[in-house]
From Swiss-Prot:
Biological role: Cell wall formation.
SUPFAM superfamilies: FAD-binding/transporter-associated domain-like, Uridine diphospho-N-Acetylenolpyruvylglucosamine reductase, MurB, C-terminal domain
Annotated pathway: Cell wall biogenesis; peptidoglycan biosynthesis
Positions of region (Disordered): 182-203
One Gene Ontology biological process: peptidoglycan biosynthetic process
InterPro entries from the UniProt entry: FAD-bd_PCMH, FAD-bd_PCMH-like_sf, FAD-bd_PCMH_sub1, FAD-bd_PCMH_sub2, MurB, MurB_C, MurB_C_sf, Oxid_FAD_bind_N
Catalytic activity from the UniProt record: UDP-N-acetyl-alpha-D-muramate + NADP(+) = UDP-N-acetyl-3-O-(1-carboxyvinyl)-alpha-D-glucosamine + NADPH + H(+)
Catalytic site positions: 149, 196
Stated family: Belongs to the MurB family.
Pfam families: FAD_binding_4 (PF01565), MurB_C (PF02873)
Protein name stated in the entry: UDP-N-acetylenolpyruvoylglucosamine reductase
Organismal lineage: Bacteria, Thermotogati, Deinococcota, Deinococci, Thermales
PROSITE patterns: FAD_PCMH (PS51387)
Organism: Thermus thermophilus (strain ATCC BAA-163 / DSM 7039 / HB27)
Length: 265
């Protein structure tokens, strides 16, 4: 187990965030020890806005045994989702194609039910192991209340591993599906971002609504509504959380959109 003081801007895809004590755990016993004081869990740092003052709690990151995987068995929650998508395709296993391009670890993808219009994480789950109240518990997906970009994990629960529901299919068919998903994601920005900023209202596109209001390019400090896709806030270099939050506020003055990101603290 490694404990160090860090700036969380170096661990988030938006490149924003203040100081914290980072606990990198590699075994189940280390995880038990790390959770003996108040904590938060950090995955790949996407879909997350950390405030400039940082967080007082321990920040736990899963490594070691939590990054091992077997596509036909248990998959560690610290495994990168893009890696799994590619490995499944190579093995001729279908079920993850709709998650192509999501820069998450498995645990974070489960917690927020990450997805695209082509599919959600919950669709690919057979079982989920969650650590809470000092023990490891296995749940079926139906017990975790998955919905649009959300789940209902037990309070303080940490996803530790999952079993995937994959089907054998011809590789050519899987690759065609992945190419379709990739084409749909081409308009997304290449600059630092935390992913889609706002949840899509029922039957509508948040990005399209933002575009129609002429908000693309709106900027506060180095935080800007992407010119490429209205539902992305990008970091032009030195953005701070306060800049991002002010930008969010200005968008929400114009449109009744719900922020999709988690905000710490």
């Amino acid at each position: 187990m490694k404990v160090e003081r860090v700036l969380l801007k170096d661990y988030t895809t938006l490149g924003v965030g203040g100081p914290a004590e980072l606990w990198t755990v590699e075994t189940r016993e280390e995880l038990k020890r790390a959770t003996e004081a108040p904590y938060r869990v950090l995955g790949n740092g996407s879909n997350l806005l950390v405030l400039d003052e940082g967080v007082p709690e321990r920040v736990i990151r899963l490594a070691g045994e939590f990054q091992t995987y077997d596509l036909k068995g248990w998959v560690g929650a610290g495994t990168l989702l893009p890696l799994l998508v590619q490995e499944a395709a190579r093995a001729g296993l279908s079920g993850l194609e709709g998650l192509l391009g999501i820069p998450a670890q498995v645990g974070g993808a489960v917690k927020m039910n990450a997805g695209t219009r082509f599919g959600e994480m919950a669709d690919a789950l057979e079982a989920v192991e969650v650590f809470h109240d000092g023990a490891f518990h296995v749940y079926c997906p139906e017990e975790l209340g998955f919905g649009y970009r959300k789940s209902h994990l037990p309070p303080g629960g940490i996803v530790t591993r999952v079993r995937l529901k994959l089907k054998e299919r011809p590789k050519e068919e899987i690759l065609r599906r992945m190419a379709e998903v990739d084409r749909a994601r081409k308009g997304q920005p290449k600059r630092k971002s935390a992913g889609c900023a706002f949840k899509n209202p029922p039957g509508q596109s948040a990005g399209r609504l933002i575009d129609e209001r002429g908000l693309k390019g709106l900027r506060v400090g180095d935080a800007m509504i992407s010119l490429e896709h209205g539902n992305f806030i990008v970091n032009l270099g030195q953005a701070r959380a306060k800049d991002v939050l002010e930008l969010v506020r200005r968008v929400q003055e114009e449109l009744p959109l719900e922020l999709e990101w988690e905000v710490w603290p």
